[in-house]
Amino acid sequence: MSRLRIFADTNPATPEFDSRDGDAIAAELVKIGVTFERWHASAPVEPGATPEQVMDAYRADIDRISAERGFKTVDVVSIAPDNPKREEMRAKFLDEHFHKEDEVRFFVAGSGLFTLHVDAKVYEIECVKDDLIAVPDGTLHWFDMGPEPHFVAIRFFTEPDGWVGHFTGTEIAKQFPRYAPKKPHKAS
């Protein structure tokens, strides 16, 4: 389930806001220019689906947001816990950075943690299946896919080179807990 926690950037121990309600999450994030939506597939997406099948299942929403925001390119990224480069991929965006274009991701499966640093606040957003998040260009943030990443996401771009991370060199991301999603309990 999606979750938003908001902290003072000097106090990673105690959230000032904590909600799993999608409407409440969207209402808080829109205050800092971030879009948060819940989408639903027009067709089921099965494990192992091709990128084309994934995009076809969400075609109406992809077309709508691409037209609204001027996206020229859409792709699908899929990362599984057994990926031999998972640690390298996780480490790539764990430090505070920004991009020169909006960072827009729709989670088809799995989860990840976007953490935004805006106006002396830290917004920790756990995105899960059916969540769309659009982080405006220039927003300081970091992303954690967890130690055993599992997600499939549709990514939107206006310019392929605009998505390069520009790192700030600050240590703030290290002050906040890393993402450790709870594993589903197995029936005994």
From Swiss-Prot:
Its recorded reaction(s) are: 1,2-dihydroxy-5-(methylsulfanyl)pent-1-en-3-one + O2 = 3-(methylsulfanyl)propanoate + CO + formate + 2 H(+); 1,2-dihydroxy-5-(methylsulfanyl)pent-1-en-3-one + O2 = 4-methylsulfanyl-2-oxobutanoate + formate + 2 H(+)
Residue(s) at site: May play a role in transmitting local conformational changes: 102
> Has the keyword Glycosyltransferase been applied to this entry?
no
Q: What is its EC number?
A: 1.13.11.54, 1.13.11.53
Q: Which GO terms describe its molecular function?
A: acireductone dioxygenase (Ni2+-requiring) activity; acireductone dioxygenase [iron(II)-requiring] activity; iron ion binding; nickel cation binding
Q: Which residues bind Fe(2+)?
A: 97, 99, 103, 141
CDD domains xref list: cupin_ARD
> Under what name is this protein listed?
Acireductone dioxygenase
Organism encoding this protein:
Xanthomonas axonopodis pv. citri (strain 306)
Q: What does UniProt list as this organism's lineage?
A: Bacteria, Pseudomonadati, Pseudomonadota, Gammaproteobacteria, Lysobacterales
